[in-house]
């Protein structure tokens, strides 16, 4: 029974929930909560069936390390690319991925997996995006502007993700799983009850996911 509570809390908690908090709420060992939460998070991976369309912004950023957010090299830094779908009311959906390099190969792979090729895409002038104009005909590269002023929505999304990551997970270990958890919940923030049901269905259909101590 408590397994269903873990799924419910992970699915519906607005800011997410740590395994420590689950342990306190459910009177279970923290390690037990951590292992089962990882199984829940595995079911939060994108299905790839719902591409972003319309107006889409894409940007890459670093997490971890002493110079969090700055482009450069660092032993503990990890690189993430984020794409957001914009509407008149703000951001409707988003996807993200940890990547090894911000080159056209890695950026292109992510964008082909998540964005409709007919979308109106906006990026900064980073060279890694330039070759992708052959695939994404409506890709526009512009200056970031003073303090990123030409990309306010995606920079705010990045800031909120980093704040959430520090508050719930405290590290960049298992970063892709954290990205999937965050974007899954964000993309369903208007349908909390349905989110729980959807996650249960996903877990039932999913292949067994084994974790070893």
Model-predicted segments: where are they?
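Residue-level recognition of single "structural anchor" positions
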Residues: 1-213
């Amino acid at each position: 029974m408590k397994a269903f509570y873990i799924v419910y809390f992970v699915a519906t908690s607005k800011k997410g929930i740590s395994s420590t908090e689950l342990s306190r709420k459910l009177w279970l060992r923290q390690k037990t909560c951590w292992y089962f939460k990882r199984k829940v998070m595995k079911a939060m991976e994108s299905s790839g069936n719902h591409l972003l369309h319309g107006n889409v912004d894409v940007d890459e950023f670093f997490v971890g390390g002493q110079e969090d957010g700055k482009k450069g090299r660092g032993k503990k830094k990890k690189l993430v690319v984020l794409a957001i779908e914009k509407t008149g009311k703000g951001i409707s959906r988003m996807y993200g991925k940890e990547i090894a390099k911000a080159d056209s190969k890695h950026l292109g792979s992510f964008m082909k997996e998540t964005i409709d090729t007919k979308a109106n895409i906006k990026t900064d002038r980073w060279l890694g995006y330039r070759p992708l104009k052959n695939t994404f005909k409506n890709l526009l590269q512009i200056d970031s502007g003073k303090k990123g002023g030409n990309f306010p929505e995606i920079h705010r999304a990045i800031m909120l993700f980093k704040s959430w990551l520090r508050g719930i997970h405290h590290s960049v270990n298992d970063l892709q799983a954290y990205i999937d958890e965050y974007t899954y919940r964000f993309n369903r923030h208007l349908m909390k009850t349905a989110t729980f049901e959807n996650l249960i269905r996903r877990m039932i259909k999913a292949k067994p996911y084994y974790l070893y101590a």
